[in-house]
Every structure is written in C-alpha cells, then in structure tokens.
C-alpha cells in the first residue's frame, strides 16, 4: 500500500533532449501532488540538455542529476542505473518518464489514488 509519506521517484533518462526538456520539467513541477523526487541521468548529451537540467536542479531541490561517469548506456541502461540509485535510497514507488513527455497535472495524484486500492 502506498503510504502518504512515500515520495514517488520519477526517473528520467535523457539524451540530446534540449528541445523537449523545458516542457517536460515544467509539467513535472506543475504536479498537484508535490511529494516526488526527480532523478535524472543524462547519457552524454551534446546539446543544452545538461544546462536545462542543472537549472532545474538549482531551482527545485526535488530535482537531482545522477552523475555516473561518461559511459553511454542507452535508455535501458540509464533507466536501470536510475532504478538502482532510487532503490538504494529506499524508494518504494517509481514513475518512468521520457524526455519528450508532458504530464498532465493530476498524473501523480491519480496514480497515488490507484495504488492505494492495491
């Protein structure tokens, strides 16, 4: 059962997503359920992705960039590393998002309601 104090770990793997990330991050910040943490792993972007992510992390303490070396892992490897990090922090619930997603404001609150019924 999802407890009220359990944050949802949002896992975001990025690669050259500069044109998508501002809208994605804005949609996460606009969630009506504020109890979340965003873990991001960039897979060696050569555009402005890291600058956008760094600004988001400076602006909101719930946003964290996972620094895990320079090896390119692809999306599967990046999500695996993000899950490992989240589990090492005691995460019980995850939400995966792609860099080109835009979430509706109720996404996490509706997910939390559905999880309480399980």
Name each model-derived stretch.
Residues 1-118:
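Nucleotide-sugar donor-binding/catalytic module of glycosyltransferases
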């Amino acid at each position: 059962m999802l407890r009220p104090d359990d944050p949802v770990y949002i896992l975001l793997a990025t690669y050259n997503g500069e044109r998508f990330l501002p809208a994605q991050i804005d949609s996460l910040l606009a969630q009506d359920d504020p109890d979340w943490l965003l873990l991001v792993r960039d897979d060696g972007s050569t555009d402005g992705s890291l600058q956008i992510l760094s600004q988001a992390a400076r602006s909101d303490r719930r946003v964290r960039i996972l620094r895990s070396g320079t090896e390119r892992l692809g999306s599967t490897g990046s999500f695996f590393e993000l899950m490992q990090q989240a589990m090492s922090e005691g995460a019980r619930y995850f939400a995966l998002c792609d860099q080109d997603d835009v979430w509706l404001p109720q996404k996490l609150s509706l997910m939390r309601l559905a999880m309480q019924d399980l």
